[in-house]
Amino acid sequence: MENYIYGHHACIEAISMEKCLMIYLSKEGRNQTQQQVERAANARKIPIRYIPKEAFKKFTKENHQYVVALISPIEFIDMSNFIDEHSKGTEPMVVALLDGVTDVGNLGNLIRTAEFLGVNLLVVPKTGSARLTEKVIRASSGAAFSLNIAQVDHIKDAIYLLKSYDFSIYGASEKKSTSLIDVKFDRLTAVILGDESKGIKPSILGLCDQIIGIPKFGKIDSLNVSSASAILFFEIIRQHHNA
């Protein structure tokens, strides 16, 4: 099955990360945004096909900006090798694990946030989670190409592996949690984020060293997982940089 993404930002990122196999542009005139994609593709010697504007409907009915890219699939990294290589020494690490995040928009936004803030690794399960489709890649604005992502059979297996390397495991939940502002994060930190409606499964929460929550100062009761992840990632990495 061929994978297509669309839109200026996602296509530019795919080109820069050498994940783009072909670019489709309108042959009926191009604006500055499309010309930027054209120049980037030419610089990397990526083939360009110029097609009628009407033909873009076969790719998507959403706002494609008349820019579509055929991309190579997301390549997952080997979690065990990555942790073994990067956890040694004195540099801090942040690993994010997802337990049942099924909304593609939330997953894409979370990936973009994780890459922007410098999360070292994102771990997703093979089942019970949104797949890394072109919609997720677009929602991430192409950040899915540059973030280290590992796929595992079961999140529990990933937790056991991280514990064997002395990672501290934090579960994000509002139930019986310690406020984020009262937590001192360890050098090797792993944070688990759960399903948008049900949260982290009890069996997974039971493996956490500490349950943490975001303090609420307003009237709404909760945040979606992508918004919550931004706050959590920032505070963890802020502490690491100030240590």
Give a label for each model feature:
Residues E28, K53-A55, T127-S129, K175, ...:
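Short, ordered loop/turn segments at secondary-structure junctions
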Residues N3, S26, D99-G100, P125, ...:
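Glycine- and other small-residue-rich loops at beta-strand/loop junctions that grip anionic moieties
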Residues S80-K88, L161-K163, I181-K184:
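Short amphipathic alpha-helix with an adjacent loop that forms part of the alpha/beta core around
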Residues Y170-N224:
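Active-site/ligand-binding-proximal alpha/beta "capping" segment
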Residues I12, M17, R138-A143, L205-A243:
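Structured adenosyl-cofactor binding patch, chiefly the S-adenosyl-L-methionine
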Residues K19, I46, S87-K176:
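RNA substrate-binding interface of SAM-dependent RNA methyltransferases
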Residues M1-E85:
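N-terminal positively charged helical leader segments and presequences
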